[in-house]
Amino acid sequence: MIPTKKIEFEKKRKVVECKKCKGVGCDACIGYCIYIDQMAEAGIPVDYWYRNIEDFYGEDNFKNSIIEYINNLNEEYRKGITLCLVGERGRGKTFAACAILKKAILEKFSTTYTTICDLIANITGPNPEIRLLIKEIDFVVIDEVDQRFFPTVLSMEFYGNQLENILRSRMQNRLPTIMCSNSPDISQIFGGEFKKSFESLGSQFIKILPAVGKDVRLNKEKL
């Protein structure tokens, strides 16, 4: 959840910095402020609001694959494939996933960004509407799908079952899901029935896109 004060600060800043109206307010400012509200509502982290995929410093093949996905967004929505961005830290997985969501917002699709921990906390909480909502949103990004958040076998199986239920529903309804993980094989994170289901659905509904190259953050470059 993005703090309200931060949202209002960013909207005010964009108006003040507007070269068209020089802070007075214009259609361009209003449009961008609406866009900021939409990114915030989707849960896209502020750090990625103003970053463009064209300026991505990571590995070229990964970058070009994401640009191709964005340029063919309507076709990707039609296919409804689950896209798994896998690779070590600092390779631009979250950057890429958020770039897809920002384009989806502009194309009038419903979107949401969440981490696996927040997702599980919400869908296992007292509000059952959240589970239904996450199954109906057009484009969903699930970040930080990693084993380190599930220290025991029981927690791995429990959370795996919750995620499997959501993914199966979205796959069957051809709704795109983008998952980001530091693990090269997401199916191994949860094991059990999730692993079997993930492997069974993989050939038809899942695409693995490796994010390789160097850790850009260590070189103080912007992802």
Which sequence ranges carry the predicted segments?
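Short glycine-rich substrate-engagement loop in P-loop NTPases that contacts/grips substrate
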Residues: 63-70, 101-137, 149, 153-157
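Short, surface-exposed polybasic-and-hydrophobic patches located at secondary-structure transitions
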Residues: 66-80
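Walker A/P-loop nucleotide-binding motif
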Residues: 78-97
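A short, basic N-terminal segment
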Residues: 1-68, 205, 213-223
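Residue-level preference for the first positions of well-ordered beta-strands
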Residues: 80-84, 139, 176-178
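Short loop/turn elements that form and flank the Walker-type P-loop nucleotide-binding site
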Residues: 78-79, 134-137, 170-174
